[in-house]
Amino acid sequence: MANVPENLHYSKDHEWVRVEGDTAVIGITDHAQDQLGDVVYVELPKVGEEFAANESFGSVESVKAVSELFTPVSGEVTGVNEAFTDEPEKVNKDPYGDGWMIKIKMKSPGEVDSLLTAAEYEDFTKAESE
């Protein structure tokens, strides 16, 4: 079973959210990076761009496929992980740490409440793979 930290919130699109005040740090789950295989390129938005919840904000290209990235919450991008320019494989090595994607100043912090808990996400991925 993939690593699913308890302190994060999860989307059914396999993104995670870590809340830091009014900021959401967003990345893809261990399950997602495992399904993708070796990541070779990550396309992220620019700081200052705004997104609605569940809107595509970029893509991840792996040796297997290209997958869109979706923001589970709405808001303005305040940071992007510049490390992906030279090291896209950080997504595979540390999806919940150095492999974070973007930081968003949340418009509606309550949106996080509609996301899955770690246990719910584990159940979702099990059901999805059956």
Model-derived segments and spans:
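Acidic, low-complexity mobile loops and tails
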Residues: 1-56, 93-130
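Conserved hydrophobic positions within beta-strands
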Residues: 14, 60, 69, 74-78
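Residue-level recognition of beta-strand microenvironments
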Residues: 17-19, 63, 80-83, 109
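A short beta-strand motif that forms part of the nucleic acid-binding face
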Residues: 30, 64, 73
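Gly/Ser/Thr-rich helix-start
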Residues: 38, 59, 66, 76, ...
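Short, Lys/Arg- and Gly-enriched loop/turn segments at beta-strand edges
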Residues: 59-70, 87-89
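Aromatic- and Lys/Arg-enriched surface recognition patch
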Residues: 78-102
